[in-house]
Amino acid sequence: MCKHFAVGLTCALSVFAAAAQTYPDKPVRVIVPAPAGGALDIVARHVNQKLTESFGTQFIVDNRGGASGAIGAEIVARAAPDGYTLLFTSASAVSLSPHFAAKPSDPLRTYTPVVLVGYSPMVLVVHPSVPAKSVKELVAIAKARPDALAYASNGTGSLSHVTAALFMQRAGIKMLHVPYKGAAPAVIDTVAGHVSVLFAGYPSIAAQERAARLRALAVTSAKRTELAPHLPTVAESGLPGFESTQWWGVYGPAGLPVEIVERLNAALNKVLRMPEIKKSLAKDSAEPAGGTPAQLAEYHKADYEKWGKVIRSAGIKGE
């Protein structure tokens, strides 16, 4: 029996190896767990167009938004690990949503990491009526008047929400949470002065900052970004070690053969070095990343565990 098992295993491995050498020989479905037209979708379409050109096989974007990315991510989790169903996702679907699932799952075991596409910091902004010109001044105001300041978020459990929760934990302050359904209404109400504070992606507030309708205080990345060089980091503004970034990654289902992972990783790294892709990412205030699958796994693990601690400490419950 053992001999038959060994022969069968050898044959199976040979089939996988042969398939990997010809991969892809049919269209690849790339699940984007977000609606069409958003930042994630736009970046995904640009990258997958280049993959199509590189392999000579269609990489087709399939938008499956809903439940903060969980619906699209689940499709990939249940797919066959043959390389023909991939996940092009933001951090929200794989670092945040799993913490709010009815049956929490470990995304590090659910998916096979392929490559880190890029990352983008958030920006801490306040309405001009708030007399704070720096992070330290904002913290001082919040400490003097607990719960007097209200902050907007893109929704309960969103990156903007957990980033604000981390900020409050680190600064030792309290602010009132006002969740919205997406970034646009959160920005609109902050500009209108209905709420005072917001963590948002830079593209969504850049025009408002230039028009002095919002005041940007700092970026949430570990170091200053070339995309907004005039802004200090939150970390250098009084909260050492503070970091929160939106990031994008490509994954396959668990068990994706290493040969296919390596082919995809090599092709994606070439794509991410292309000037036109760098330009596309820059429009969303993002920088390309690249690297190995192991580097994405390490980055994802740290991000997932960090937000888990913040969510549990703040008592945040999913919608």
Language model features with spans:
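Bacterial N-terminal signal peptides that target proteins for export
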Residues: 1-9
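N-terminal signal peptide c-region/cleavage motif recognized by signal peptidases
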Residues: 12-19
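N-terminal (or domain-start) structured segment
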Residues: 20-110, 148, 156, 172-199, ...
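An extracytoplasmic/periplasmic, membrane-proximal ligand-sensing/linker region
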Residues: 25-27, 169-173, 233-236, 258-319
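Short coil/turn segments
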Residues: 35-37, 91-92, 122, 127-132, ...
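Hinge/capping helix and adjacent helix->loop/strand transition within the periplasmic-binding protein
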Residues: 78-84, 98-185, 234, 247-280
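A ligand-binding cleft/hinge motif common to bilobed small-molecule-binding domains
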Residues: 92-102, 166-170, 197-231, 308
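C-terminal lobe and pocket-closing loops
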Residues: 119, 205-273, 302-305
